[in-house]
Each structure stands twice: as C-alpha cells, then as structure tokens.
Regions:
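Single conserved hydrophobic/aromatic residue that forms the stacking wall/gate
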Residues: 142-145, 149
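Short beta-strand/loop segment that forms part of the nucleotide-sugar
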Residues: 31-40, 58-60
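Short, acidic, metal-binding catalytic loop of nucleotide-sugar glycosyltransferases
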Residues: 22-31
Length: 149
C-alpha cells in the first residue's frame, strides 16, 4: 500500500461523499486506501459510509475531536505515506499520486503540509493562504517593508 488517505467526518455526509468520489475519480497509478473516521455523526453518515466497501470506515461513538480522530485513522493505516484530507475537499487532479511521487523523490523529508488552491464556482482562484514562517519568509517580509518606506 503506497498511501493511506485519512478523512475525519462530523456531520458532513454530503461533503464527505463528494470528497470520496473525487479521490476515486481523480486517483490513478498509485495504490491507496481511504480511511474515514466518523466522529459520532448524527446526519445519517454512519448508514451511508458503513456500507461503502471502497473505504475503511471507523465509527467513534463520541466526538474525539479532529486530532484524536486522525490518530484513530493512523492506527488503521497500511500505507507507507499518510495523506490527511479535510472532508470538504474536492481533488481536481491526481493529487494522491503527485503526493506519492514527491515523497518518493524526497526521502529526506519526513513531514510536510500541502495547501489547497481554492476555486470559486467559475474556477477562479480565491486567495486563502499566507506564507509559512521560515527564515526566508521573514527576510522577504522585512526587505519588502523597507522597500516601501
């Protein structure tokens, strides 16, 4: 197993269904599993996802919170790499394979974060992010501040 995709759901059955469908439709050329951890949803999620053979469904009878629910998913994961995905995410490209390829080409990197490009209904980008704080980012911000004076 190359990648375990871990999703936490709490009363977002419709969004989570769309997320899962996008993973399946957009992912190829990589071996992956989808692990869905349900944080005691009351919106019918259990009835929908417990029957879905394409996913590994884990139901918690209490809301564990996001972090503990992810840890529950990690315990069940078989993949060499873990891909944490929010339930309201739709993949538009072969992101799981791109993630896997990056991990394989960069074995010295042990942890990473990937930010999404948000798009509106017309596929225009929505600015939704900033820079990570790194020495380079601090220097860049400091230099830019002095240029504007």
């Amino acid at each position: 197993m190359d990648v375990s995709v871990i999703i936490v759901n709490y009363n977002t059955q419709g969004l989570t269904s769309d997320c899962i469908e996008s993973i399946i439709a957009q992912t190829s050329a990589v071996e992956y599993e989808i692990i869905l951890v349900d944080n005691a949803s009351t919106d019918g999620s259990k009835e929908v996802f417990a029957q879905d053979k394409r996913i590994k469904y884990i139901y918690s009878d209490q809301n564990l919170g996001f972090g503990r629910a992810n840890n529950l998913g990690i315990r069940e994961a078989k993949g060499r790499y873990l891909f944490f995905l929010n339930s309201d995410t739709i993949l538009l490209n072969n992101a799981v394979k791109l993630f896997f390829d990056f991990c394989e080409k960069n074995p010295d990197r042990k942890i990473g974060a990937v930010g999404a490009v948000l798009k509106d209904q017309n596929q225009k980008n929505i600015h939704s992010y900033g820079r990570f704080i790194t020495p380079g980012a601090v220097s860049y911000t400091h230099l830019r501040a002095h240029e504007t004076k």
